[in-house]
Amino acid sequence: MGRELDVPVAIAPATPDLARVASRVAIPVLAQHVDPVDAGPRTGFVPPEAIRASGVWGSLVNHSEHPLPPTEVRSAVERLHALELVAVVCAGDVDVARKLAATRPAYLAVEPPELIGGKRAVSTARPEVVSGAVAAVREVSPGTRVLCGAGVHDRTDVRKALELGASGVLVASAVTLAADPRAAIEELLTGFV
């Protein structure tokens, strides 16, 4: 769908599905989480080498549902970079976005935790968070693209995020909980055209 509208799209399936999905789709695949640990005796941890072996493009880091201390975020991003994988770092507010931008991720998604999974998009409920994060990230890491997450459900939310300076959006529940996920994706994509 994204190709038809010339909109880049990536997907972040559950960890057990990474290799299967990565081998079957033509779009970038992201892990939902990675731990900054070496491969070896690390029960329950997800080392960057493991996701790389799955054929993924990169990983989310520090999602509000799986936060890491700032030092671990930095280590995770460094490990991903060393393996030539993309880091999509998540931040809950402008101050955290500014601090984590120093890790120089390819993308930084700003998602206030209280709006994740809700019906109100951060781009409309708290637009200053999006515009503030865009300004802060550009100041610290001009090459990092800012994504807008939390409550993004439709083309209006996407357009507002782009107007505020975001390069794209990060969504989950708008698609995974939709009665018709394909229609939900199409609705979101039309916000880019």
Where does each model-flagged region fall?
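C-terminal helical cap(s) of enzyme catalytic domains, especially alpha/beta-barrels
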Residues: 76-82, 122-128, 162, 173-193
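Conserved N-terminal beta1-alpha1 strand-loop-helix module at the mouth
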Residues: 1-46, 87, 95-105, 177, ...
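Catalytic cores of alpha/beta
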Residues: 91-104, 141, 148-169
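Glycine-rich beta-to-alpha transition loops that act as phosphate-gripper elements at the mouths
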Residues: 33-36, 40-43, 69-71, 90-95, ...
